[in-house]
């Protein structure tokens, strides 16, 4: 949406009258809707820009169902932003870091540091909520400082909440080495041992208890942190059996 508004803004000043995108801070938004006043530009031209960007997104991100459309609506009323404030919102959307920032040097293919813009909305004021994740605390702090600096440059304010500590990967783990053969014996298959890029309770526990050896297990969850998230019920029973057997052997 930021890219779309930026392209329209290059042709004519804009005033945002409403902005709604995303519903959860830690999830990638599925849709975004904006009402605006475009002074002196016809709807046909705006739709041409939308169509061009839609084709680019479908090709670049392999999203054949991605849709960008413009409609002629009554955009007046509500909390309309000035052209200057609208320009700052567009600058934020286009300039803020987003997505993968660094990959792990220990585990190929593992994201080490990332963030996403989860919620953006215009109420009494415009607000944007980012979720920042990293398995290295120093990198997370650096990314948070980038967001703080960007807010300051655009005459905005910055606040932070819901922080959880990083859970750094341990190359040696007695608990992990104990659980692998138990899984193999129970299910006749090789367990898939992975490091993941997510905020988990293990990070909180390991921060409080120095040297804690911990492993995260759970049932199969598909399309996590999206509107299509769902749980495989049969895997819940398998996880319970596995947990009981691990506890017997500790």
Residue ranges of predicted features:
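Generic long, charged, amphipathic alpha-helical segments
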Residues: 152-186
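His/Asp/Glu-rich mid-to-C-terminal helical/loop segments that flank catalytic regions of hydrolases
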Residues: 2-11, 42, 84-94, 101-102, ...
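Short, flexible active-site loops
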Residues: 125-134, 158-165
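Zn-dependent metallopeptidase/amidohydrolase metal-coordination segment
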Residues: 105, 112-114, 118-127, 131, ...
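Short, contiguous acidic/charged loop-to-helix segments that flank catalytic cores in large enzymes
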Residues: 135, 166-170, 230
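C-terminal, non-catalytic macromolecule-binding modules
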Residues: 129-155
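Short glycine/threonine-rich loop-to-helix capping motif typified by GTGT followed
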Residues: 26-33, 78-84, 168-181, 204-208
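Midchain, well-structured core segments that form catalytic/ion-binding scaffolds
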Residues: 1-132
């Amino acid at each position: 949406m930021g890219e779309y508004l930026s392209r329209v803004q290059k042709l004519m000043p804009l005033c945002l009258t409403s902005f709604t995108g995303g519903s959860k801070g830690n999830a990638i938004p599925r849709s975004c809707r904006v009402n605006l006043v475009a002074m002196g530009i016809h709807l046909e031209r705006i739709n041409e820009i939308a169509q061009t960007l839609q084709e680019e997104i479908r090709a670049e991100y392999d999203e054949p169902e991605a849709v960008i459309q413009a409609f002629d609506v009554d955009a007046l009323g509500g909390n309309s932003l000035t052209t200057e404030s609208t320009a700052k919102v567009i600058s934020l959307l286009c300039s803020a870091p987003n997505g993968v920032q660094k990959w792990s040097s220990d585990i190929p293919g593992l994201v080490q540091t990332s963030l996403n813009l989860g919620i953006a909305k215009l109420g009494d004021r415009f607000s944007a909520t980012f979720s920042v994740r990293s398995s290295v605390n120093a990198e997370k702090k650096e990314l948070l400082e980038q967001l703080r600096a960007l807010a300051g440059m655009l005459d905005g304010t910055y606040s932070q909440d819901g922080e959880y500590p990083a859970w750094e990967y341990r190359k040696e783990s007695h608990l992990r080495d104990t659980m692998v053969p138990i899984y193999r014996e129970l299910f006749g298959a090789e367990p898939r041992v992975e490091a993941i890029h997510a905020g988990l309770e293990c990070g909180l526990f390991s921060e409080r208890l120095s040297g804690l050896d911990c492993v995260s297990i759970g049932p199969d969850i598909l399309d996590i942190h999206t509107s299509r998230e769902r749980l495989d019920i049969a895997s819940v029973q398998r996880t319970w059996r596995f947990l009981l057997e691990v506890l017997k052997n500790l």
